């Protein structure tokens, strides 16, 4: 989620910037290759079978582990920053395979096995989709606006200090 505000590839290339790519690849491979889902993008979101909200995701990416389950479009939108071709293909697949796109944009979730859609909009998830699309279509405009702030300019370079990807 921070990628909608911070250009993590630029400011944290040896940590969060690379981790963003790894996370997107694992999301995709787990859903498509392990679970054999036709679409990917698991994260906490609304549940299709009730009015609730639950944690879904990729077990190895969660602190406590997640249960497999529904797919939510906001994950794919966030991946536009690091794997744009794959993200666009997944958004198209979601629209082609499921009734996931409504009058105000993407509904919150779909069960890729049953095809059941949570026909509701969650403002948090819609916000992530909106900002991710604004960045993708507007030359990273949200990230650039944030980075132009004098306070941000003082702290963003500190992200480069952390290196948790070296041997």
Predicted regions span which residues?
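Ser/Thr/Asn(+Pro)-rich, low-complexity disordered segments
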Residues: 1-167
């Amino acid at each position: 989620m921070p990628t909608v505000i911070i250009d993590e590839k630029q400011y944290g290339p040896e940590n969060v910037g690379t981790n963003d790519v790894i996370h997107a690849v694992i999301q995709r491979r787990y859903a498509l290759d392990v679970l054999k889902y036709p679409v990917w993008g698991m994260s906490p979101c609304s549940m299709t079978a009730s009015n609730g909200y639950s944690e879904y995701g990729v077990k190895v990416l969660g602190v406590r582990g997640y249960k497999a389950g529904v797919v939510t479009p906001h994950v794919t939108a966030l991946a536009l920053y690091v794997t744009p071709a794959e993200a666009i293909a997944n958004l198209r697949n979601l629209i082609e395979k499921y009734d996931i796109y409504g009058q105000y944009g993407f509904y919150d979730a779909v069960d890729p096995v049953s095809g059941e859609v949570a026909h509701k909009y969650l403002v948090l998830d819609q916000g992530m989709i909106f900002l991710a699309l604004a960045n993708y279509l507007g030359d990273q405009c949200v990230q650039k606006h944030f980075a132009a702030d004098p306070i941000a300019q003082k702290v963003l370079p500190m992200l480069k200090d952390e290196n948790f990807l070296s041997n």
